[in-house]
Amino acid sequence: MSRGLGDVYKRQTQNELNEEAAKNLIANGVLAVTEGANMPSTLSAITAFQEAGILFGPAKAANAGGVAVSALEMAQNSSRLAWTFEEVDRKLYDIMATIYEISADAAKSFGQEGNLVFGANIAGFLKVSQAMSEQGIV
């Protein structure tokens, strides 16, 4: 089977990309799927992508870019700075690369190498649990 070279950028509402749509994308040679909304893919769609070896970028990691840019804007405004597009783009790239690395490393550490959904979930859990522990909550 040859893989297609095109990209598909879908921005759905919650649970809109289902297993049938996932299998259609797989059959047509999709290489990677990155969620661009909050939970747009059903669990069965995600499973289909993972079983087919398709790189899958989960919403919680992929959507962090919007949150990161908002934080950069707040930092820029509070410091009365004016960053160029290139500066913001570089900072965002670094943030997103770090999110990928943390997610990939967490997945690998827990025996799920390549499973970015698992890695993002574990990394998020570990960050929250560490904060709770440091605050004496648990």
Regions found by a protein language model. Give the residues of each.
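Adenosine-phosphate binding glycine-rich loop
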Residues: 10-12, 23-138
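Active-site environment of divalent metal-dependent phosphoester hydrolases
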Residues: 15
